[in-house]
Amino acid sequence: MDLTQLSCEDFLSRLASKAPAPGGGGAAALVGAAGVALGNMVGDLTTGKKKYAAVEEEILALNAHAETLRKRLEALVQADADAFTPLAAAYGLPRETPEQQARKAAVLAEALDGACAVPLDIMDACCEGIRLASDYAEKGSVLAVSDAGCAALFCKAALQASALNVAINTKLMTDRAHAAALDEKAARMLAEYLPLADEVYQSVASRLRA
């Protein structure tokens, strides 16, 4: 089943259920995609307006980037579900003999690595989404500036949620050096892009209250 083909109602019903997927990872990817789509909407509301003719080409380039990024995040909704399957299978492997224990440890290590790769990819995409939101807030139509602020907040939430999904998997890794490297990669993205998202929000909020 391709989760991205479900209706909103069906997706949320599955999310609310005990079904293994979607979970927090897929939901984060969807929220990030919604954030990017909001930014793209700001761009579409800006193009073709005489007032913004000077930034028309820049906005069109942002829109092209946003469309590609949204599709990437949509694909990561399903990718997160796909990554959970081998992880669940690994936990179910027998470990009665030393050979079985060794095999389970190896399979689990590989599955945990795969389960970290998807949220790290979602994080990377959300960082791009926050950069786009910043550009849309700066250059886009003032009539849609609130949506640029929402875009930044959506991508920020998805970024933080995905960091939690990295952490829950690295915590279970026996290779602590590898786990630390993945945690550091996530931490660097948080350190750089959470302040940018907050900056976009504060800028938009200040403009709306002026």
Model-derived features with residue positions:
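Preference for long, well-ordered alpha-helical segments
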Residues: 129-132, 144-204, 210
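Amphipathic, well-ordered alpha-helical segments in soluble domains
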Residues: 11, 34-41, 83, 122-132, ...
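Amphipathic alpha-helical interface segments
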Residues: 80, 84-153, 157
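A structural-propensity feature for long, helix-poor, extended segments
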Residues: 50-89, 189, 196
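Conserved phosphate/anionic-ligand binding catalytic regions in large, soluble enzymes, centered on
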Residues: 17-38, 144-162
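Transmembrane signal-anchor/signal-peptide helices with a preference for the extracytoplasmic
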Residues: 41-53
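Short, hydrophobic/aliphatic alpha-helical segments
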Residues: 3-21
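Amphipathic alpha-helix face/heptad-repeat signature
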Residues: 30-34, 62, 69-76, 115-125, ...
